[in-house]
Amino acid sequence: MTDLRYTLLTDGPTDRALMPILTWLLRGCGVRCAVQPVWADLGRLRVRGKPSLAERMGLAVEYYPCDLLFVHRDAEREPRQNRYDEIMRAIGELRRDRRVVTPAVCVVPVRMQEAWLLFDMEAIRWAAGNSAGRQPLSLPSIQVLESIPDPKEVLYDLLRNASELNGRRLDGFDVSERAVRVTSFIDDFSPLRALPAFAALEDDVSMLVLEQCWA
């Protein structure tokens, strides 16, 4: 294999921040060929009604062909296992009805993916466009990340504080887009192994890499 193409299907556009994490996991699991990630931007497609998760997965594979499909759902207020089972049912439905056999991995952060972006202060400063900033930032400890009720708002507040902007300049600060950039400034995601949801994802990726002989 000269390259490995993966497609990420997410709840929303800001969740494409997961891509550097997924690429890092693949590398850590032994993938040495070129990795070509793409985010499935289904919002560009004209689709009637509200497609089911299985239908969205089918569209992702059809319009963004890949060797591996990552399917993201935030657990939010649901137990992580509920979301995981939901994705697995959709995978089974897709394979029965559409004969799509692309390998798939469930990506289910507890609460929401922003919880996985709250451990690297320097990355937050870089993403905020103020890498030399001196405004104190209070990051939660890694052990409590999965218990934070609204990690997105915590991340957004950190980015606003890190920017050290105020007034109209702060009003024009696109915090959601800045949040997407955080992972691009992180080289090592190993601290997240302390989180059960992340550890489970790494185990699933490792197992699939071995099954597919990608290492």
Short names for language-model regions:
Residues 1-5, 15-43, 48-68, 72-215:
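C-terminal accessory helical subdomains adjacent to catalytic cores in phosphodiester-
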Residues 8-10:
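Short hydrophobic beta-strand that contains or immediately precedes a catalytic carboxylate
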